[in-house]
């Protein structure tokens, strides 16, 4: 069975593909309306959909979150995990209700997040993180992540790559890769090239989720 793609996903707001990436933005608009975020095309929607646990190195994000929130960003989180991290993100959402949304962790909501989001925050290369990275990339969401077999660090000179890889396990290395991604996000043509590199869209197997 091939991986479900946004071209054939009935759970998202608007289907889209590599060739129709402009329709991805319609998902962002609808998601922001449904989950209380202030939509702005110029502001990237970041997402985090893997379990909020120590194993997934959430401390690296916790250490740098204030620096991230000083940027023009929005954040969608599926808030399931250890109590410490659930409380951390719940408090952030209370402080920034129009910028941060805690979303119920189910498959339909996750796929809406993938369809709406621009950047995926991956704090580890555990199997459960890599599983979410792969799904998100298939929806044109660009990961900030440690090096792993799924990704190639973006090279702007060659216009190659599908992720922004941080090479040191430190908050500042993570933050530098995020800033690099956000700078590229300002250039729609370049960003679309990265998205198309990330997306896998089998043309010969059209699957539709009718659930």
Functional labels for PLM-detected ranges:
Residues 1-211:
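Catalytic cores of carbohydrate-active enzymes across secretory and cytosolic contexts
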């Amino acid at each position: 069975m091939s991986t479900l793609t946004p071209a054939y996903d009935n759970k998202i707001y608007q289907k889209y593909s590599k060739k129709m990436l402009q329709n991805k933005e319609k998902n962002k608009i609808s998601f922001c309306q449904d989950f209380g975020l202030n939509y702005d095309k110029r502001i990237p929607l970041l997402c985090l959909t893997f379990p909020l646990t120590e194993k997934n190195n959430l401390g690296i994000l916790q250490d740098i979150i204030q620096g991230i929130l000083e940027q023009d960003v929005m954040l969608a989180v599926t808030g399931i995990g250890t109590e410490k991290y659930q409380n951390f993100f719940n408090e952030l959402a209370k402080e920034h209700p129009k910028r941060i949304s805690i979303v119920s962790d189910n498959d339909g909501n996750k796929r809406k997040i993938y369809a709406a989001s621009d950047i995926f925050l991956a704090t580890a290369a555990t199997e459960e993180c890599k599983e979410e990275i792969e799904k998100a990339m298939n929806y044109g969401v660009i990961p900030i992540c440690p090096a792993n077999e799924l990704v190639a660090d973006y090279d702007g000179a060659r216009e190659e790559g599908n992720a922004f890889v941080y090479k040191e396990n430190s908050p500042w290395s993570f933050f530098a890769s995020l800033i690099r991604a956000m700078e590229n996000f300002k250039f729609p043509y370049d960003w679309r090239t990265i998205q198309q590199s990330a997306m896998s869209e089998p043309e010969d197997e059209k699957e539709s989720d009718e659930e």
